[in-house]
A protein has these predicted regions:
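Conserved catalytic core of two-metal-ion nucleotidyltransferases
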Residues: 1-31, 38
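Conserved nucleotidyltransferase catalytic core and NTase-mimicking acidic/glycine-rich helix/loop elements
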Residues: 40, 45-167
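Short acidic (Asp/Glu) and glycine-rich catalytic loops that position anionic groups and cofactors
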Residues: 3, 33-34, 86-89
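Alpha-helix capping at helix-to-loop junctions
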Residues: 18, 25-32, 56-63, 67
């Protein structure tokens, strides 16, 4: 649970737009006024944070892939461990393009796939590995890395090319 004042939220929206977008999407009000209901999240702020986060994730998987030196357990842990961190960016991308923001992870993946006509099956594969606690082969992990790299590169370009239209 988080406790925040309206002033704190207002002063933090441009710094943490993805976090507030996620909170607005999934929060449950326990008591008092719903201060997240009418917050205004700027597309320019979301675009910037999405690009920064996606580029950071691309660096992370590249560095992690090299650092793991073929260790299947380390690679699996890195890929599966970082999985949930992609969904705020996916929500941000959908927000930028005025799409519905699904809560269920499979639906989020499908929405981004449909938006850009790209294959995000690698994320579905990672969800499957996580839910079934499986241990992929070295070849499968190499394919996962290559697919993640290509998908992230494509998403970064899409976000980078997104134009903020004046109000």
């Amino acid at each position: 649970p988080l406790i925040m004042t309206r002033d704190y939220i207002d002063r933090s929206l441009e710094v943490f737009p993805l976090e507030f977008l996620e909170m607005k999407l999934i929060h449950q009000l326990v008591y008092g006024e719903d201060v997240l209901k009418n917050i205004s999240i700027g597309k320019a702020d979301v675009r910037l944070q999405c690009e920064r986060e996606l580029k950071g994730k691309l660096q992370h998987i590249c560095q992690g892939y090299i650092k793991a030196m073929g260790n299947k357990s380390a690679l699996t842990d890195m890929f599966v461990g970082s999985l949930s961190g992609y969904f705020p960016e996916f929500h941000g991308i959908l927000f930028l393009f005025d799409q519905k923001l699904p809560k269920e992870k499979g639906a989020v993946i499908s929405a981004v796939e449909n938006l850009f006509d790209i294959d995000l099956g690698v994320y579905k594969k990672l969800l499957e590995i996580k839910s079934q606690d499986t241990h992929p082969s070295a070849e499968s992990l190499k394919e996962i890395f290559e697919k993640l790299y290509r998908v992230l590169d494509t998403l970064i370009k899409k976000v980078d090319e997104f134009e903020i239209k004046p109000a």
